[in-house]
Amino acid sequence: MIKNLEEKDMSNEAQVKKLTDIMAQFVGFTAKKLPDDVIAKLQEMRDKEDTPMTKVIYDTMFRNQELALKLNRPSCQDTGVLQFWVKCGTRFPLIDDLEALLKEAVIQATVQTPLRHNSVETFDEYNTGKNVGKGTPTVWWDIVPNSDQCEIYTYMAGGGCTLPGNATVLMPGEGYEGVTKFVLDRMTTYGLNACPPLLVGVGVGTSVETAALNSKKALMRPVGSHNDNANAAKMEKLLEDGINSIGLGPQGMGGNYSVMGVNIENTARHPSAIGVAVNVGCWSHRRGHIVFDKDLNFTVDTHTGFEYKEEN
C-alpha cells in the first residue's frame, strides 16, 4: 500500500513537471510568434492601405516577426505581465497544482525565452526579476463540472496597450449611447500611444469589476469573431467603424484602419446600472490558447508550429 502511494506521488510529480515545462515553452513561444489570426489580419489591413508610409510600417511589423523567429527572441521587448485565464474541469488531475506550476512556468520562461522583468512589487517598488510577485502572474478561473480537460489562455499585457484600459458605471439612462461614448473617448485620448492597430475588448455588466473581466476575456477571442447576441455583434461593427474613422493608422501615423476589430463580452446587469470597461491589445497581440486532456496531450488553436521539446 505504501509503495503504491509512493508510485502515485512520483507519477504526480512527473506530471506536474511535464505540464510546467510545456507551459514554460508555450509562454516563450507566445512571446515570439504572433497568433495566426493576428498575422492574417495585419496582412489584410496592409493590403487595404493606400499610402507608402502605412505600407512601410506594416512591412516593418512583418520583418520584425520574421526576425523574432529567426533570432529566437520575443517579437516585442515589452513581454508584459503574464496573465492566464484557466477553464479547468473538476476532474482534471492537476487542478490542485495549476496555480503554483503556472508561476514556476513563468519563472522558467523568464530565463529561457528570455522575458523582460516586468513584475514590480507595489508600494515597495522593486522589480522581482522573475516576472512573478504578489498576485502575478494573474490567474482567472472558470471551473467546469464533470470535465477532465483544462483550457489555458495565455496573455502578455504590455505597458503601452494597458494604458487605455478603464472602467466605469453608467446611469441606465445613458444607455448604449453612453457605452459608445465611453469607448470612443478612451480610443481618441489614448489609442494613439497603444501601438495600433489595436484589438479592442469591451466588457458590459453591472459593476466595474464584472465589466473589466468581461473586457479582458473579450481580448482572448479570435480576431474577426462576433458576439453571439445579434445586437452586441452589431455594436461591435459600429464601434469598429467608428474607431477606424479616427484614422490612427499603424503606429498612430495615420491610415484607413485603427483597429483589428472590436470584441464585446457581456453579462446580465442590474436595472439601475450599466458597467462598461475597455481593454486593449496592441498590434503585437500576444495571446495563446492551449487545451490539455487528462493525460496532458494538448492542442493549440491560436498558433501553428508549437512543439513541446521534452527535456532529457
Model regions and ranges:
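Non-transmembrane, aqueous-exposed alpha-helical and coiled segments at domain scale
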Residues: 2-312
